[in-house]
Swiss-Prot record:
Pfam families, alphabetized: AAA, AAA_lid_3, FtsH_ext, Peptidase_M41
Annotated transmembrane regions: 4-24, 109-129
Subunit details: Homohexamer.
Superkingdom of this protein's organism: Bacteria
Protein name: ATP-dependent zinc metalloprotease FtsH
Length: 636
């Protein structure tokens, strides 16, 4: 590919030099100061003995009169009488070959030929370069669009093993079974079993689908063929199907083997959707895949493994038994899984003694394996930036904040008055988190701007919650209202800010779901009303139910929010003095943890109902827990 580009560049350079040389020669040979003259006039001047000197270049005559005037004209080919006349009249005549246009002239025939053929050679070079790009090979593959782009691993395998995959023990068992079958198929066939023809890994981005496939390739003792779904999509009709056939032809030659198709939704999207483009190349590719997986021309020994983030859009024919027999969901890791993943990624990183990976695992609920690896990498970069020899706990905590909330904006210009209001807002959230007995334990409060947030209150639950009772939900609403209520208690109704916008949105949504989704309202009763919000092109919200029912739901939601607001405001007003001390400390240090927060409250005689809690080691805990983080972010 680089050679073809170099050839094209040299074509352009040579062509430019030829054209420049030709123009320079013509410019040098031309006489811009000569006066054009007709041949008849020149003949008359010769007869009148007015010409003293003449220079003949091919078919052009440049004559100099005796009074110093320079004139030029052209003579027809073969007309030589004027030359004889000038010699007869004593004119000094010089003759030289033409500088261009005469192919027979010495040295100019090559230049003329190159000028004539240069456009043809230029277009030929561009065409060859395009063919090499699309064919992805040498000159013999200029038109080989249908060749597969799959990578075949026979001797060289990815250096990833199942031991490098953590946080998905059940999935690893399924994969280990496939490896066992490839190693000893007779043991399974003895019982009449057959291997699955296809395995589909699906889950959210970053959970480890491709990593698991790499581990399978590293463990299996059979050839591994890897290809992306987008490799089958091309601008030419039929190329995708041809590449699909070529991929499976390669697989048959290397059977038994494994074919891994990453991002299969690129070609496996459900058929029948509206296609404004006429012929759908993707559908042809999908049809060919269906035939290859379970058609008349199938062969034994080929295992298809695919990965996707969108199983809901795949064609039903692709998911039926006989094609993808097993569909394995890869979830986000729980707290134990996150702990195991952190240990795997921390093996090659020097950690200080104060690093607690268990606490990091609890502080990162909802994080995928890719997110956790990114956190450890960010922590390593932060430690290197500070010229440390080890990664400390503070580096990991800062890395979590960077990933979750964005970079610190310490240079952001915030007036002392605004900073105080932000501190009051966040202190109100934190106080309600400590005063609600059913709330999740407080972790820390910060007023350092990060991303779009001006402050954040973080809670780290210690128990896994799969269901929530009404008390849990009401506690969440009280905590969300804490920021706005603190502003009103400290500054009055006219002093409230726009910082509670996100809090009110979340509280309203939660209250609506309490009433209309989970049926927890005594007045409305046990009923569930679906509400569809369509933001596309300004779409409106569509809610089921009669107008009277919807009106009753709205009244109950308003009542629930008003009650929570008044109760929250009462609690904050009763502890205003203690909260003022917290605000001063928060303005001074910008970040305080739960322990320091409680110590300040205890100095004012305030007893919290939800103290800071610690959990025993995950190594000793029998049941896995899944903490969830609750962030209250002030967006102004």
């Amino acid at each position: 590919m680089q050679t073809a580009k170099n050839i094209l560049i040299w074509f352009l350079i040579i062509g430019f030099m030829i054209v420049a040389f030709n123009l320079f020669e013509e410019k040098g040979s031309s006489s811009p100061s000569a006066t054009p003259m007709s041949l008849t006039t020149l003949v008359d001047m010769v007869k009148q003995n007015k010409i003293g000197e003449a220079d003949i270049k091919g078919d052009k005559i440049i004559a100099y009169t005796k009074d110093g005037q320079k004139v030029e004209t052209y003579i027809p080919k073969g007309y030589t009488s004027i030359i004889d006349e000038m010699i007869k009249d004593g004119v000094k005549v010089k003759a030289s070959p033409s500088s261009g246009g005469d192919i027979s002239s010495s040295g100019n025939w090559l230049v003329s030929m190159l000028i004539s053929w240069f456009p043809v050679l230029l277009f030929a070079g561009i065409w060859i370069l395009m063919m090499r790009q699309m064919g992805n090979g040498g000159p013999t593959r200029a038109f080989s669009f249908g060749k597969s782009k799959a990578k075949v691993y026979i001797e060289e395998k990815p250096n990833v093993k199942l031991d490098n995959v953590a946080g998905m023990d059940e999935v690893k068992e399924e994969v280990a079974e496939v490896i066992e079958y490839l190693k000893d198929p007779a043991r399974f066939r003895k019982l009449g079993g057959r291997p699955p023809k296809g395995i589909l890994f699906y889950g959210e981005p970053g959970v480890g689908k491709t990593l698991l496939a790499k581990a399978l390739a590293g463990e299996a003792h059979v050839p591994f063929i890897s290809v992306s779904g987008s490799d089958f999509v091309e601008m030419f009709v039929g190329v995708g199907a041809a590449r699909m056939r070529d991929t499976f032809e390669t697989a048959r030659k290397n059977a038994p083997c494994i074919v891994f198709i990453d991002e299969i939704d690129a070609v496996g999207r459900s058929r029948g959707a509206i296609n404004l483009g006429g012929n759908d190349e993707r559908e042809q590719t999908l049809n060919q895949l269906l035939v290859e997986m379970d058609g008349f021309d199938t062969s034994e020994g080929i295992l298809i493994i695919a990965a996707t983030n969108r199983p809901d859009i795949l064609d039903p024919a692709l998911l039926r038994p006989g094609r993808f027999d097993r569909q394995i969901f890869i979830p986000k890791p729980d707290v134990k899984g996150r702990y195991e993943i952190l240990k795997v990624h921390a093996k090659n990183k020097p950690l200080a003694k104060d690093v607690d990976l268990e606490l990091i695992a609890r502080a990162t609920p909802g994080f995928t394996g890719a997110d956790l690896e990114n956190i450890l990498n960010e922590a390593a970069l932060l430690a290197a930036r500070k010229r440390k020899d080890l990664i400390h706990m503070e580096d990991l905590e800062e890395a979590i904040d960077r990933v979750m909330m964005g970079l610190e904006r310490r240079g952001m210009a915030i007036s002392p008055k605004e900073k105080e209001k932000i501190a009051v807002h966040e202190a109100g959230h934190a106080l309600m988190g400590l005063m609600m007995p059913d709330a999740d334990p407080l972790h820390k409060v910060s007023i350092i701007p990060r991303g779009m947030a001006l402050g954040v209150t973080t809670q780290l639950p210690i128990d896994d919650k799969h269901i929530y009772d009404k008390a849990d939900l009401l506690s969440r609403i009280h905590i969300l209202m804490g920021g706005r209520c603190a502003e009103e208690v400290f500054y009055g109704k006219d002093g409230i800010t726009t910082g509670a916008e996100n809090d009110l949105q979340r509280a309203t949504d939660l209250a609506y779901r309490i009433v209309a989704t989970w049926g927890m309202s005594e007045n409305v009763g046990p009923i569930s009303v679906r509400r569809n919000i369509n933001p596309f092109l300004g779409g409106s919200t569509v809610t089921e139910g009669s107008p009277d029912l919807l009106k009753e739901i709205d009244k109950e939601v308003q009542k629930l929010l008003a009650s929570a607001y008044e109760e929250t405001k009462r609690v904050i007003a009763e502890n205003k003095e203690a909260l003022s001390s917290v605000v001063k400390r928060l303005i001074e240090k910008e970040t305080i943890d739960c322990k320091e927060f409680v110590e300040i409250l205890s100095l004012h005689g305030v007893e919290v109902k939800n103290a800071c809690k610690q959990e025993e080691s995950l190594e000793k805990k029998e049941n896995n827990v899944e903490p969830k983080i609750d962030k209250n972010v002030v967006n102004v």
